[in-house]
Amino acid sequence: MAIKTVQDLINEGVQGRHVLVRADLNVPLSDGNITDPGRIDASVPTLKALLEAGARVVVSAHLGRPKGEFKEEFSLAPVAEALAERLDQWVPLATDVTGEDAHERANGLDDGDILLLENVRFDARETSKDETERTEFAAELAALTGDNGAFVSDGFGVVHRKQASVYDVAKKLPHYAGGLVEAELNVLRKVSEAPEKPYAVVLGGSKVSDKLGVIEALAPRVDNLIIGGGMCFTFLAAKGYEVGGSLLQEDMIDTCKDLLERFGDVIALPTDVVVAERFDKDADHRTVDLNSIPEGWMGLDIGPESVKAFAEVLSKSKTVFWNGPMGVFEFPAFAEGTRGVAQAIIDATAAGAFSVVGGGDSAAAVRTLGLNEEGFSHISTGGGASLEFLEGKELPGVSVLES
């Protein structure tokens, strides 16, 4: 069954109706300041469209992992301010999630007004494994929309989670996909169902175990699978290299051997790495080939020869999916691998390739390194969700919209 969209809701008539919007506003904070507002920016178009159509918008979202109790550092107060700036209107923040203050403020909304509920994860029922508890909380969220409410799911970064504000609440109200969720699904379908060949996937990040599902799902279908980041050292160990003090998942070595046996013709690994004597931004470091990693030193980035080889592969690709940095990009000395590969993807895109950055740390790296975001075809807001989609897993927050 086709999923109804926020545009369908607006066409049906939304003026004067309360609309609950689940957004993904889980942004990184430092001393109470937002360091990367990407997810807030991505949620604005859907909110604007509803407000301009005269809806009374109630926004639910989470921030961090407060474990079911109020914690000041996880309050959505900085997010309310950032939203107000972008929407050019006041965004009041309820002091609770579904309590007295939330109800009072929701009831007091006029057409075109917006309310942000406090962090949904301040209520332990949001993430409960007990369906009865989640259903009860979802009913309380739905009650904020009165008699003629609707639910818009626009937090793509959370659709892979079976949580009250994402999944259970959709069963309580007429439900629609927001513009962001709709756009994300369209892009991922394009990449997974009929990618233009040659198709290259670039995977980084620290653990093989985190990416195993996506490697298994994609390796048989791609032309090139480039592996960097901390996870490459378990693959290199599987090939017999001494990796020194680099990150190593010993229990995954046999799995990597098996993957290399089956997909060795498409898997590309680094040929040189940047090693450091300790994990520190100012650590003594040098570039070495794979046979020369000093004992006890740790690989924190891929080397320039690897970047060159990977860039060559990417320059011939027509579809590129990238998830996970090539090194510890937060430390300038170990950011060049990520920068080089990202730039190669931007260059491939300029030459006509369709490129997707799969959210999470990759999207953060693009912004941290000051790369041109417009240089990619699409930057996803959902790391985990985009990986699970490409693995072929059901996304609860999407499947519930189909019912």
Curated annotation (Swiss-Prot):
Catalysed reaction per UniProt? Answer: (2R)-3-phosphoglycerate + ATP = (2R)-3-phospho-glyceroyl phosphate + ADP
Q: In which pathway does it act?
A: Carbohydrate degradation; glycolysis; pyruvate from D-glyceraldehyde 3-phosphate: step 2/5
Q: Which Gene Ontology MF annotations are present?
A: ADP binding; ATP binding; phosphoglycerate kinase activity
Q: Which CDD domains match?
A: Phosphoglycerate_kinase
Query: InterPro entries annotated for this entry?
Result: Phosphoglycerate_kinase (IPR001576), Phosphoglycerate_kinase_CS (IPR015911), Phosphoglycerate_kinase_N (IPR015824), Phosphoglycerate_kinase_sf (IPR036043)
**Where is substrate bound in this sequence?**
D24, L25, N26, R39, H62, L63, G64, R65, R121, R161
UniProt entry keywords in alphabetical sequence: ATP-binding, Cytoplasm, Glycolysis, Kinase, Nucleotide-binding, Transferase
Which residues are listed for ATP binding in this entry?
Answer: K211, G299, E330, G359, G360, D361, S362
What is a single Pfam family found in this protein's UniProt entry? PGK
Its Gene Ontology cellular component terms are:
cytosol
What does the UniProt entry say about where the protein is found? Answer: Cytoplasm
Q: Does the keyword Kinase apply?
A: yes
Q: Give the matching SUPFAM superfamilies.
A: Phosphoglycerate kinase (SSF53748)
Q: Which HAMAP family match?
A: Phosphoglyc_kinase (MF_00145)
Quaternary organization = Monomer.
Regarding protein family, the annotation reads: Belongs to the phosphoglycerate kinase family.
Protein name from the UniProt record: Phosphoglycerate kinase
